[in-house]
Amino acid sequence: MIWYFAYGSNMNPARLSDQRLKERAVQMGPRIGGRLDGWRLVFNKVARQPAGAAAANIVEMPGAVVHGTLNRMPEAGLDVLDIWEGVAGGHYARRDVAVTRGDNGETVPAVTYVALKVGEGLKPTREYLAHLLAGEDLLPPDYHAWLKMQACLD
């Protein structure tokens, strides 16, 4: 079993578990809050549609923090996520990171995805941002409030 760190639309448990993993018979284990230090959340991943839309990405930045969800799953879950994240098409790449667990403060190795197809002046759609906001149960209130304030394309 591995830890997968979600900071974007996969923070929505229904999207990750029901729409992505379960349909490929991958059972997800515990889902807890996580903190990735030294990275910043940005919306610069070129989304498939509409024009000008962004998906979430993370970039290294000393002193910054990204909050998200740590999701326990079998390694086969990453193969499923590779398809959804467009790894073969060069959209995202897997990245090994160290994430601090929200429940006990322990730092654990995890896998996340970093965008490769990026652009400037992009914004998330409200529909996309709603997936991030669905992680509210495991996000610090101030981080969730910051997410809600993000400018959207529509």
At which residue positions do the language-model features occur?
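Glycine-aromatic micro-motifs
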Residues: 1-154
